[in-house]
Curated annotation (Swiss-Prot):
Protein name per the record: Small ribosomal subunit protein bS20
Alphabetical UniProt keywords: Ribonucleoprotein, Ribosomal protein, RNA-binding, rRNA-binding
InterPro entries to which the protein is assigned, alphabetical: Ribosomal_bS20, Ribosomal_bS20_sf
Protein purpose: Binds directly to 16S ribosomal RNA.
Record family assignment: Belongs to the bacterial ribosomal protein bS20 family.
Organism: Chromohalobacter salexigens (strain ATCC BAA-138 / DSM 3043 / CIP 106854 / NCIMB 13768 / 1H11)
Pfam families attached to this UniProt entry: Ribosomal_S20p (PF01649)
Region (Disordered): 1-27
GO BP field: translation
GO CC list: cytosol; small ribosomal subunit
Keyword Ribonucleoprotein recorded: yes
Length: 88
């Protein structure tokens, strides 16, 4: 437990950031699921539309450090690879 006033404030701020970041990561997972669902449905056009919507969201969350930039790149790369395989 934080003993000083400053430590108590830092604990509050850390908890607020944790909750906000959890919400942001959840949003990213939702966008990823939409793309995967479109891929599994076999609809290339829908998959591309969902992917184009997901890309800026993933990048924005990575810029805010809720997820790492490398993880964001890995996610986008894997989704794009699956979409290309669907088109072939």
């Amino acid at each position: 437990m934080a003993n000083t006033k400053q430590a108590q404030k830092r604990a509050r701020q850390a908890e607020q950031r944790r909750q906000h970041n959890a919400s942001q990561r959840s949003m990213v997972r939702t966008y990823i699921k939409r793309v995967i669902k479109a891929i599994q449905g076999g609809d290339h056009a829908q998959a591309m539309t969902e992917f184009k919507a997901a890309q800026p969201v993933i990048d924005r969350i990575a810029d805010k450090d809720a997820i790492s930039k490398k993880k964001a790149a890995r996610i986008k790369s894997r989704l794009n690879k699956r979409i290309k395989a669907l088109a072939a």
